[in-house]
Amino acid sequence: MKARLPDSPLDWLVSKFAREVPGVAHALLVSVDGLPVAASEHLPRERADQLAAVTSGLASLAGGAAQLFDGGQVLQSVVEMQNGYLLLMQVGDGSALAALAATGCDIGQIGYEMAILVERVGGVVQSCRR
């Protein structure tokens, strides 16, 4: 049995996203300090921790590049891998939403669905930090 993250009030939203958006295998909401906040239901704790670290690092690098080259705020990042995609989208408070998706997916549709989810969780994440 693989350990899971402790239940978060946002787990059901992130799980619903991963379950209902075609091509998405896993999704994770990562705090501004790189810790997993909410994870899709089939993402083991160890993998959630690893994905959180990767997400935090990539978000930081993308933000640094945007700042260095006057690119404004990073809206999303896409990493295309041989066997799938890693999509990142920033939540208003500096947190990030990560999604792992299959190669044959519609990344435009996933990006759209991520934007909707980010809108839904953004206020909740910000109020939890207060």
Swiss-Prot record:
<dbReference type="GO" id="GO:0005576">
    <property type="term" value="C:extracellular region"/>
</dbReference>
<keyword id="KW-0843">Virulence</keyword>
<keyword id="KW-0646">Protease inhibitor</keyword>
<dbReference type="GO" id="GO:0004867">
    <property type="term" value="F:serine-type endopeptidase inhibitor activity"/>
</dbReference>
<dbReference type="GO" id="GO:0005829">
    <property type="term" value="C:cytosol"/>
</dbReference>
<dbReference type="Pfam" id="PF03259">
    <property type="entry name" value="Robl_LC7"/>
</dbReference>
<comment type="subunit">
    <text>Interacts with human cathepsin G protein.</text>
</comment>
<comment type="similarity">
    <text>Belongs to the mycobacterial serine protease inhibitor Rv3364c family.</text>
</comment>
<protein>
    <recommendedName>
        <fullName>Serine protease inhibitor Rv3364c</fullName>
    </recommendedName>
</protein>
<keyword id="KW-0722">Serine protease inhibitor</keyword>
<dbReference type="InterPro" id="IPR053141">
    <property type="entry name" value="Mycobact_SerProt_Inhib_Rv3364c"/>
</dbReference>
<dbReference type="InterPro" id="IPR004942">
    <property type="entry name" value="Roadblock/LAMTOR2_dom"/>
</dbReference>
<comment type="function">
    <text>Effector protein that binds to the host serine protease cathepsin G on the macrophage cell membrane, inhibiting its enzymatic activity and the downstream activation of caspase-1-dependent apoptosis. Thus prevents macrophage pyroptosis and helps M.tuberculosis survival within host cells.</text>
</comment>
<keyword id="KW-0964">Secreted</keyword>
<keyword id="KW-1035">Host cytoplasm</keyword>
<dbReference type="GO" id="GO:0030430">
    <property type="term" value="C:host cell cytoplasm"/>
</dbReference>
